[in-house]
Amino acid sequence: MSKVKKVVLAYSGGLDTSAIIPWLKETYDDCEIIAFCADVGQGAEELVGLEEKALASGASECHIVDLKEEFVKDYIYPTMASGAVYEGTYLLGTAMARPIIAKAQVEVALKVGADALCHGCTGKGNDQIRFESCFAALAPELQVIAPWREWEMESREDLLDYLAERNIETTASATKIYSRDANAWHISHEGGELENPWNAPSKGVWTLTVDPEDAPDKPEYLTIKVENARVVAVDGVELSPYDALMLLNEKAAAHGVGRVDITENRTVGMKSRGCYETPGGTVMVAALRGIDELVHDKPARKWRDQVGQEFTHLVYDGRWFTPLCGSLLAASEALAKDVNGEVVVKMYKGQVTAEQKRSPNSLYSEEFATFGDDNVYNQKHAEGFIRLYSLSSRIRTLNSKK
């Protein structure tokens, strides 16, 4: 333990990381603590006074790194282009943020000459795996410290007592029962009443979106332009990836879009329940799927679904910095180049639907698909196809009658 001289801590200013700073100094022979905070769009209010708080807790420096644009452009957009959705519902909001945070933390550690990295993830969750897998891929020479797997404290009350004994102020309290994680893409809510799956989430759980029952009685429509499976404009206004997401977050949240309540399978083996709010992301996914339906044939969509599922588990399980990630992204981008066009989405009472869609790469032909008269499709041709398509079934039945 005495060998650790300088540690870079992934710091949020919350209860856990506020307690970790003095614990590190006490446990590792008064080592130097560098606090690192990644701005991934969790909200400006979360960053106010953060540096002062870190220094007051015992850190010698606090590095706040703006990663918002990079996060959306290089992590969220490629993941959504792949069609990744965990267990049919979860849009990977927490999981997608971990690799960029870990990468930036490693960069700070190498810059300041640290010999260890530290995170505040619990020993029960997925995040410890995600962070440490990234650390192993990017800087295996650095020691990793995970206080929740080392110290004897077991509850929020223990942490509050620990800080009180050292006269370190915190805004946390035993009554703040939910564990939340926010970024530009989403906010997650866990703990408290949600730990019993028979309990419906109370109104106090949700913080980002309007209750669908209280949403406007009139729907709102947006025209979304997509290029290479990326949203590039909304209602004719070209926007950066981050600005597009922020606008869609605002619009969709007002209509209660993007709420999910799921019980998921964690990488560590247990099930956990989470309530997630992903308003803008839910609209983006609806728009991308609308274009995807037009431009990809059956084999391409089947392949995209396979790639998406593989990429889903790669992101969820913390394997971003691996050769497999590069391979899956390459496959995804090969299909994404055709996902171009415009979609009109309708947002109403918690729902979003793609009402209108068009693409220069569309494989849909009204001439062929019409139920009316046409001069391009000879329906008699279907007979020979069906005989060949069903040949194995025909042979199987004939053989059974011999």
Curated annotation (Swiss-Prot):
- CDD domains found in the cross-reference section: ASS
Question: Which residues does the annotation say bind L-citrulline?
Answer: 90, 126, 130, 179, 188, 264, 276
Against Pfam families, the record matches this protein to: Arginosuc_syn_C, Arginosuc_synth
List residues binding L-aspartate: 122, 126-127
**Pathway connected to this protein:** Amino-acid biosynthesis; L-arginine biosynthesis; L-arginine from L-ornithine and carbamoyl phosphate: step 2/3
What's its top-level EC category? ligase
Q: Give the catalytic activity.
A: L-citrulline + L-aspartate + ATP = 2-(N(omega)-L-arginino)succinate + AMP + diphosphate + H(+)
The subcellular localization recorded is: Cytoplasm
Q: What keywords were assigned to this record?
A: Amino-acid biosynthesis, Arginine biosynthesis, ATP-binding, Cytoplasm, Ligase, Nucleotide-binding
| E.C. number | 6.3.4.5
A GO molecular-function term, please?
Answer: argininosuccinate synthase activity
Question: What's an example GO cellular component term for this entry?
Answer: cytoplasm
Positions binding ATP in this chain are 10-18, 38, 120
Q: Which GO terms describe its biological process?
A: argininosuccinate metabolic process; L-arginine biosynthetic process; urea cycle
| InterPro entries membership | Arginosuc_syn_C, Arginosuc_syn_N, Arginosuc_synth, Arginosuc_synth_CS, Arginosuc_synth_type_1_subfam, AS_cat/multimer_dom_body, Rossmann-like_a/b/a_fold
Which HAMAP family does the record match to this protein?
Answer: Arg_succ_synth_type1 (MF_00005)
**Subunit description:** Homotetramer.
- NCBIfam families attached to this UniProt entry: argG, PRK00509.1
The family this protein is said to belong to = Belongs to the argininosuccinate synthase family. Type 1 subfamily.
Protein's name according to its UniProt entry: Argininosuccinate synthase
List the source organism.
Answer: Psychromonas ingrahamii (strain DSM 17664 / CCUG 51855 / 37)
Name the lineage.
Bacteria, Pseudomonadati, Pseudomonadota, Gammaproteobacteria, Alteromonadales
- What gene codes for this chain? argG
